[in-house]
């Protein structure tokens, strides 16, 4: 599972995901990619599930790049605990994804296999997505 080795602070405020992605909106490594169309918090487990779905469908051929990293700690309080008494402990790690962000890239496989692999990955994610293809070849 993806998570940072060390962070400056243990816990983070919730915040909001506003605006479009400033960077990471173009394909950099692969020929095919999966682009987010709405703002959402994607967890490390969801990223790993999407990666597994893609690599299984591609039968270990080609290459997959993960362009997002879960660097936001999400806290939760235990079940049946009253309000107050401080912020809960870190439960999982997540990545705040803005619209326009390329989350995964694929290369080294044919177009039908790549599109199906990205479709399977999109089903594991809580974000509406679009498959993008590099045009400058």
Swiss-Prot record:
GO terms for cellular component: cytosolic large ribosomal subunit. GO terms for molecular function: rRNA binding; structural constituent of ribosome; tRNA binding. It holds the Pfam family Ribosomal_L16. Residues 1-16 have a biased composition (Basic residues). Coiled coil: none annotated. SUPFAM superfamilies: Ribosomal protein L16p/L10e (SSF54686). Residues 1-22 are annotated as: Disordered. One of its GO terms (biological process) is translation. InterPro entries: Ribosomal_uL16 (IPR047873), Ribosomal_uL16_bact-type (IPR000114), Ribosomal_uL16_CS (IPR020798), Ribosomal_uL16_dom (IPR016180), Ribosomal_uL16_sf (IPR036920). Keywords: Ribonucleoprotein, Ribosomal protein, RNA-binding, rRNA-binding, tRNA-binding. Binds 23S rRNA and is also seen to make contacts with the A and possibly P site tRNAs. Part of the 50S ribosomal subunit. Belongs to the universal ribosomal protein uL16 family. This is Large ribosomal subunit protein uL16. It comes from Jannaschia sp. (strain CCS1). The lineage of its organism: Bacteria, Pseudomonadati, Pseudomonadota, Alphaproteobacteria, Rhodobacterales. The gene is rplP.
